[in-house]
Curated annotation (Swiss-Prot):
DNA-dependent RNA polymerase catalyzes the transcription of DNA into RNA using the four ribonucleoside triphosphates as substrates. Mg(2+) binds at D462, D464, D466. Belongs to the RNA polymerase beta' chain family. Binds 1 Mg(2+) ion per subunit. Binds 2 Zn(2+) ions per subunit. Its cofactor is Mg(2+); Zn(2+). The lineage of its organism: Bacteria, Pseudomonadati, Pseudomonadota, Alphaproteobacteria, Hyphomicrobiales. It comes from Rhodopseudomonas palustris (strain TIE-1). One of its GO terms (biological process) is DNA-templated transcription. This is DNA-directed RNA polymerase subunit beta'.
């Protein structure tokens, strides 16, 4: 009988059932208990017999037999001797598989330190003993003695003595008066002698006493390690090894190659070194060799063991014969090729194939074309079993032959096997879950896989040679999941934003667009048709054209379910399109009675999905695809070079811009503007010109042309392609027929001279050269950024992988407030789009009538959002993942709608991974898309505010002055202009820049499009608030101010230079003061002098003695020249935000509300303090480098959270000062801005899920009576548990603040050490986990994949739940039995059967 079958019933090692895994330091006893024998010899196998040497590294006596059930000498063979130990060769007769699990050990002649606990920073041994790593190494490597027991001598405990000092001390105090040792033995004794309880108490006392922050931190670190050893059951001396375990031989195999040579695992070499040195040391000790030789041997043994555990961490890397570093045990786990990432998290699978893909337009959406040859190979086992079942073959061999000969009956059987058996298609790179989808295979001839055109956008596939892999789900459960969850027909919506992803593109869009065009004056205009037959007849007999305006009787079912008839004005093409639309009262003909662009089609699909359900949508999609292809082919659209129309006004615009640029040049030569300002203005002028030419071109291309008979001519084909969204964009058309415009240098700056030609006219040599910059940069960027994007996705997945929907509702009353996002007066994200599919955190009421629109706790659907919009609600509080109160995972209410299904989210959905994929996937796509516009520069600098509504002006914090030129100027930074509609609702608010010209005032009525304010975007002014005479302070020629002569103009301009770097300039405080008629410095209205401090690089606009009025400009600070905004700023920016890095020049934020006061300067920093408005708070002081521009004056009032120094705020500051909600809003907005710039839609909830994971830790501020240490970071779960325990025992709980961790840090500090170790820094994670005796509860996805279980998400989540219920029932039954046994001790065994409690 087959051995394997026998072994099913008595496996060599029983399968283990476990709920958690614990890791700790192995004690010598533990290592010996694992071992099956000591390895005494370094030999591996005998070179003649090829049998393993006894007591060697492959010894059969220790590790088990080489062949199944056969001892080494061959005396006992076969199953019947199972378990016997041969008396000749001492080998147990058993399965050879035990060679994979039996371990051995090496008994060391001298103890050695474990390198991970010694060298992995921070050094655990060093921290416990409070010694530096340098000192430890000196002891370990036999340079210095350490005093263990000073006795009555003057020596101190743990004092280091060199050889001479040691001998001198022995002479001085006598041989036995003190104990000092050297080497690992000494450190082992020190560790053994530690009294952890005593040290713990001592450290806590010291921490209470110390005031120094640094010392407190140092003590806290040491205390943490002491506690780790106290509570984990690890003993400190176990960090020094006396026994080294040897891993099973089949995990470090020796494989014979042809030609009599062997390939071996590096570990064997490393073990051999250890054994050789150990044996030599034993021999030297027996021979009583001189001390110096023994010490050298011990040092070499330490080095050998170090190399075995972690080669290259200390000293030189040990290399093999071919100068290649040997792979140590640590290297086996680390990195992409290590055990975790190569074998445990990413396995290769059988039953798969790959081939090139071609388009399959006649397939249905749920089908894919599978080549017959491929199917035959993939489904072989199924075919064999079916052949056997049908009696066509009796043995596997026969079946094999039939299949190889490809007999007709085999093809019939293949058809049966494949029917209803889905296969998975995958296209690399799999950036999100739609990169693997299930299809039903259709057998085809040929060797290429056929793919349905509509799923291409989900796979990001095209047919230019892409390849795809096919996988076969084998088990019934796998087939079920593939069909129900992964079928392409079940993935119509994009998980990132809930929009349809099965959308037509390219040819299909063009065909549908062509079908829906309406033109005036075509033959048959105004005819009326009663039904489709008539219409088709007229079309075929050419009485009417597809685009003719006609009237048609449309039969339709209204909301009440009655049949109604409408007379429509439409075109023949649109009627044909209307035939495929599902009949539903919610889908009137108006949905498609318009020009169908890609956007419109996507909208129609979305509506069909929401109103008619999934099945109808799939049918509809397939039908419009066929229609689109057919009409694109019928239309026969093509284009020639005359279709690219160069606008007639092009040269006029170019000439006028050239004149303008000359003017700027002249102004610069006259010294009116600086070089930077000239550059900005020229670039601005040219980008405006480019836009204008593009506009003109679009106007001419899209213009309606009339034929001689008055009918409209065919639309320009290039315009059709771009306008429909089939191919090309206005930006590309501009380059073809307008002007290419400005180009960027590789550094990102814009070249001042634009490319005036377009591709139709052809570029001159110089223009061509200028344009190569941008193109080349685009290509280089792509290569670099694809990698970065992949790495970002990996970090995101890692931080969010254990975020799963675990409950329906956590019942929290917390939430975050949502408003529309307005950028520069235009709404970039409406309130409706942000709250759709979220749960209301409180009742949403109509502001006018106060009636409830949405109840608290209800999911907001499309109709609710529409109602909220109609009511004019400005702000809605919603539930969010950030405020969900569940300990593990997130609840369904806080998450809201599952975007990919359009229904409330299911229990067990892995929302963390979906969030990570949704954020990471466009990253890669964007990086690949940078160069499409060929580096053509895109500038957008907003410097005008126009009203978007009619209404009345309300100004908050009004401060307006009329300057010398008669303009109204904003004098403060926090002035806000709001536009209010007649019933008092705020429609828009605009923050007005300091120094902006304001064109309206309080109470004015404005019309839509009216200009409210404008400013110069390239400079920041410093304005005067009083009328008087200018005087300078500390503005000394060549010390704090320099007159620079512009070489090209000969005009001088005065710029403030860095005065600290000049001689004697350290105490200067350059300023402009304004004096009255009496020559004294004037006072400002709010107190303080009229003294305006200047920062480096300020350009003076006034002279001494000049008269100024309020609102006049004293000086201006030029801002950076405009860089192109490209995703280059994008990806690194997203990574920076998720990693929560402090920006380089971070903004300084006011921590309290109060009044600004300037204090005495400190070295080269300015001292600024805020006197609080609230008397209970303490004043705050800030030191600000002198070069930074502080735009506040003495006596200004700031609000909590206002910027004192401009810049990007550090997210940690926002969290500390304004709290979680503000931080979330900031991160969500900043990240969304990057994606919005690229036109990528991502739902806010995905970013919220990631931010939630970044906020899982709490920093203890006061430890109370708990065991936590103030200053340490604790997991939220642990924090709450320990505090609950403290409250229960009547003790004082600890307090703490949430801390924001970057995603990498958060991943490494997750509760699961498996997850962290498989992410990065494996050594450090495992060392720390072992010292703490960490327990991995196996809650996340990664840990479960690593231990080889179903993940606790999706179908795995329900399995886990069922298991929980079963355990509970079993417990109940056992408890019941125990009770009964207690009541009736001598009852008969036939107790009545227990009734089972109902399942939950």
């Amino acid at each position: 009988m087959n051995q394997e079958i026998m072994n099913l019933f008595n496996p060599t090692t029983p399968a283990q059932v476990f709920d958690q895994i614990r890791i700790s330091i192995a004690s010598p006893e533990k290592i010996l208990s694992w071992s099956y024998g000591e390895i005494k010899k370094p030999e591996t196998i005998n070179y003649r017999t090829f049998k393993p040497e006894r007591d060697g590294l492959f010894c059969a006596r220790i590790f088990g037999p080489i062949k199944d059930y056969e001892c080494l000498c061959g005396k006992y063979k076969r199953m019947k001797y199972k378990g016997i130990i041969c008396e000749k060769c001492s080998v147990e007769v058993t399965l050879s598989r035990v060679r994979r699990e039996r371990m051995g050990h090496i008994e060391l002649a001298a103890p050695v330190a474990h390198i991970w606990f010694l060298k992995s920073l921070p050094s655990r041994i060093g921290q416990l003993l409070d010694m530096t790593l340098k000192d430890l190494e000196r002891i370990l490597y036999f340079e210095y003695y350490v005093v263990l027991e000073p006795g009555l001598t003057d020596l101190k405990e743990r004092q280091l003595l060199s050889e001479e000092e040691y001998l001198r001390a022995q002479d001085q105090y006598g041989q036995d008066s003190f104990t000092a040792m050297i080497g690992a033995e000494a450190i082992r004794e020190l560790l053994k002698g530690l009294e952890l309880e005593k040290i713990d108490a001592q450290l806590r006392a010291e921490m209470a006493e110390t005031d120094s922050d640094i010392k407190h931190k140092k003590l806290a670190k040491r205390l943490k390690i002491v506690e780790a050893f106290r509570y984990s059951g690890n003993k400190p001396e176990w960090m020094i090894l006396t026994v080294v375990p040897v891993i099973p031989p089949d995990l470090r195999p020796l494989v014979p190659l042809d030609g009599g040579r062997f390939a071996t695992s590096d570990l064997n070499d490393l073990y051999r070194r250890v054994i050789n040195r150990n044996n030599r040391l034993k021999r030297l000790m027996e021979l009583r060799a001189p001390d110096i030789i023994i010490r050298n041997e011990k040092r070499m043994l330490q080095e050998a063991v170090d190399a075995l555990f972690d080669n290259g961490r200390r000293g030189r890397v040990i290399t093999g014969a071919n100068k290649r570093p040997l792979k140590s045990l640590a290297d086996m786990l680390k990195g992409k090729q290590g055990r975790f990432r190569q074998n445990l998290l990413g396995k290769r699978v059988d039953y798969s194939g790959r081939s090139v893909i071609v388009v399959g337009p006649e397939l249905k959406l749920h089908q894919c074309g599978l080549p017959k040859k491929m199917a035959l190979e993939l489904f072989k086992p199924f075919i064999y079993s079916r052949l056997d079942a049908k009696g066509l073959s009796t043995t596997v061999k026969q079946a094999k032959k039939l299949v190889e000969k490809e007999r007709p009956e085999v093809w019939d059987i293949l058809d049966e096997v494949i029917r209803e058996h889905p296969v998975l298609l995958n296209r690399a790179p799999t950036l999100h879950r739609l990169g693997i989808q299930a299809f039903e295979p259709v057998l085809i001839e040929g060797k290429a896989i056929q793919l349905h055109p509509l799923v291409c956008s989900a796979f990001n596939a095209d047919f230019d040679g892409d390849q795809m892999a096919v996988h076969v789900p084998l088990s019934l459960e796998a087939q079920l999941e593939a069909r129900v969850l992964m079928m392409s027909t079940n993935n119509i919506l994009h998980p990132a934003n809930g929009q349809p992803i099965i959308v037509p593109s390219q040819d299909i869009v063009l065909g549908l667009y062509y079908l829906s065009i309406m033109r005036e004056g075509l033959p048959g205009e105004g005819k009326v048709f009663a039904d489709l037959a008539e219409l088709e007849h007229a079309l075929y007999s050419k009485v009417i054209h597809l685009h003719t305006k006609i009237k048609y009787r449309w039969h339709w079912v209204n909301e009440e379910g009655e049949n109604t008839v409408r007379l429509l004005e439409t075109t023949a093409g649109r009627i044909l399109l209307g035939q495929v639309l599902p009949k539903s009262p919610k889908l009137p003909f108006d949905v498609i009675n318009k020009l169908m662009t890609k956007r419109e089609i996507s909208g129609v699909i979305d509506q069909v999905y929401r109103h008619c359900g999934q099945k109808e949508t799939v049918i509809f999609c397939d039908r419009i695809m066929a229609l689109g292809f057919f009409n694109a082919f019928k239309a026969g659209i093509s284009f020639g070079k005359d279709d690219m129309v160069v606008p007639g006004s092009k040269w006029k615009i170019v000439d006028s811009t050239r004149t303008l640029a000359k003017d700027f040049e002249q102004q610069y030569n006259d010294g009116l503007i600086t070089h930077g300002e000239k550059y900005n203005k020229v670039v601005d002028a040219w980008s405006k010109a480019t836009e204008e030419i593009a506009k003109e071109m679009m106007k001419e291309i899209s213009a309606v042309r009339k034929a001689p008979d008055g009918s409209e001519q065919q639309v320009n084909s290039i315009y059709m392609m771009a306008h429909s969204g089939a191919r090309g964009s206005p930006a590309q058309m501009r380059q073809l027929a307008g002007m290419r415009g400005l180009m960027a240098k590789p550094s990102g700056e814009i070249i001042e001279t634009p490319i005036i030609s377009n591709f139709k006219e052809g570029l001159s040599v110089l223009e061509y050269f200028n344009s190569t910059h941008g193109a080349r940069k685009g290509l280089a960027d792509t290569a670099l950024k694809t990698a970065n994007s992949g790495y970002l996705t990996r970090r995101l997945v890692d931080v969010a992988q254990d975020c799963i929907i675990t409950q329906a509702d956590c019942g929290t009353s917390l939430g975050i407030k949502m408003r529309a996002i307005v950028d520069a007066g235009t709404v970039v994200a409406s309130l409706g789009s942000r709250i759709l599919g979220r749960t209301a955190g409180e009742d949403v009421r109509d502001p006018a009538t106060n009636e409830i629109i949405v109840k608290r706790g209800d999911l907001m659907e499309e109709r609710d959002v529409e109602a909220i919009h109609q009511a004019g609600v400005q702000e809605v509080k919603i539930r969010s993942a950030l405020t969900c109160e569940l300990v593990n995972g997130i609840c369904g209410k806080c998450y809201g709608r599952d975007l990919a299904r359009g229904t409330p989210v299911n229990h067990g959905e892995a929302v963390g991974v979906i969030a990570a994929q949704s954020i990471g996937e466009p990253g890669t796509q964007l990086t690949m898309r940078t160069f499409h516009i060929g580096g053509a520069a895109q500038i957008n600098e907003q410097s005008v505010i126009e009203s978007n509504f009619d209404g009345k002006i309300v100004i908050k914090n009004r401060a307006i002055a009329r300057n010398g030129e008669g303009h109204n100027v904003a004098m403060v930074r926090n002035m806000v202009i709001a536009i209010v509609d007649p019933d008092g609702t705020e429609r828009a608010t605009h923050r007005i820049q300091y120094g902006a010209r304001v064109h309206v005032d309080e109470g004015d009525m404005v019309k839509r499009g009216q200009r409210i304010a404008e400013w110069d975007p390239y400079t920041r002014p410093i304005l005067t608030e009083v009328e008087g005479t200018i005087d300078f302070e500390d503005l000394i020629e060549d010390q704090s101010i320099s007159e620079t002569l512009d070489e090209s103009t000969g005009i001088a301009k005065r710029i403030v230079i860095d005065w600290r770097s000049t001689r004697g300039g350290a105490d200067l405080r350059p300023a402009i003061v304004i004096k009255g008629k009496d020559g004294k410095v004037l006072k400002l209205a709010r107190g303080g002098d009229a003294r305006y401090m200047l920062s480096v690089d300020a350009i003076l606009s006034v002279d001494v003695g000049a008269q100024v009025k309020p609102g006049d400009i004293l000086a201006r600070i030029s801002t950076e020249s405009a860089k192109t905004r490209d995703i280059t700023g994008g990806l690194p920016r997203v990574a920076e935000l998720f990693e929560a890095r402090r920006p380089k020049d971070a903004a300084i934020i006011a921590e309290i509300a109060g009044t600004i006061r300037f204090g005495r300067d400190y070295k080269n920093k300015r001292r600024l303090s805020i006197e609080p408005l609230d008397k209970n708070e303490e004043a705050r002081e800030y030191l600000i480098p002198k070069g930074k521009h502080i735009h506040l004056q003495d006596g200004d009032v700031v609000e909590k959270g206002d910027f004192i120094v401009e810049g990007n705020p550090a997210p940690h500051d926002i969290l500390a000062i304004k709290g979680i909600e503000e931080l979330a809003a900031y991160l969500v907005n900043e990240i969304q801005e990057v994606y919005r710039l690229q036109g990528v839609l991502i739902n806010d909830k995905h970013i919220e899920v990631i931010v939630r994971q970044m906020l899982q830790k709490i920093e203890i501020t006061d430890q109370g009576d708990t065991d936590m240490i103030s200053g340490e970071q604790v997991d939220k779960i642990e924090f709450n548990a320990l505090n609950a325990k403290a409250v229960e025992e009547g003790k004082k709980p600890a307090t703490g603040n949430p801390v924001l961790l970057g995603i990498t840090k958060a991943s490494l500090q997750t509760r699961s050490f498996f997850s962290a170790a498989s992410f990065q820094e494996t050594t450090r994670v495992l060392t720390e986990a072992a010292v703490n005796g960490k327990v991995d509860p196996l809650e996340g996805l990664k840990e479960n994949v690593i231990v080889g279980r179903l993940i606790p998400a999706g179908t795995g989540a329900s399995m886990a739940k069922i298991r929980e219920v079963a355990v509970k029932r079993d417990r109940l039954i056992l408890d019941e039995r125990e009770k009964q046994a207690a009541i009736v001790p001598a009852a008969a065994p036939e107790a009545e059967p227990l009734s089972l409690p109902p399942a939950e």
